[in-house]
Amino acid sequence: DMMPHCADKLKNHYEITYLGHGWESIVTRMKDAGYDVAQITFATDYIEEVRKHDVQFTPIAIGTGTKGKVLDALSNGLLVVGTPFALENIAVENGVSCVEYHSNEELLAALTDIPHHVEKYEVMAEKGREAIFREHGRKRISQQLIDLFK
């Protein structure tokens, strides 16, 4: 609900794409508020679609059902802006390799800052990508699994 009300601060800096079903009413509200918004209800190649974007918002409030999508975004070089639940147990650090927010005010501050400091956030996204390959890579995880049986 926050973004339609903050349109004047953000709408000229972002093109927003919603992936998946169930976003229709929010897409309409965002368009009515002046945002450039699209919805892709089904992507035949999810990873290819993710790679077309720069930032992924992960406002997960409870549960871990989309944790894989957070890892997909990070490993493909997107800046992830998410809640503590979204980033829980992922080897990233707030302000270094991702942006973690705890309130709508923190989210708005980050979204307002990103267009004015693009290079800073590009570096952050790259550090997130590197962290995922280093800490969550197949080789490291499989070695840890093998070590359990030694």
Protein language model features and the residues they cover:
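Conserved catalytic-core segment of nucleotide-activated headgroup transferases in glycan assembly
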Residues: D1-A33, Q39-K52
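A structural motif in glycosyltransferase catalytic domains
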Residues: D1-M3, I16, A73, L107, ...
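A charged, aromatic-enriched C-terminal amphipathic alpha-helix characteristic of glycosyltransferases
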Residues: E119-F149
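Conserved acidic donor-binding segment of nucleotide-sugar-dependent glycosyltransferases
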Residues: S97-E105, D113-V118
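Cofactor-binding loop segments of dinucleotide-utilizing enzymes, especially the Rossmann-like FAD-
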Residues: H21, T83, S103
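Short acidic/histidine- and often glycine-rich active-site loop of Leloir-type glycosyltransferases
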Residues: P84-E100
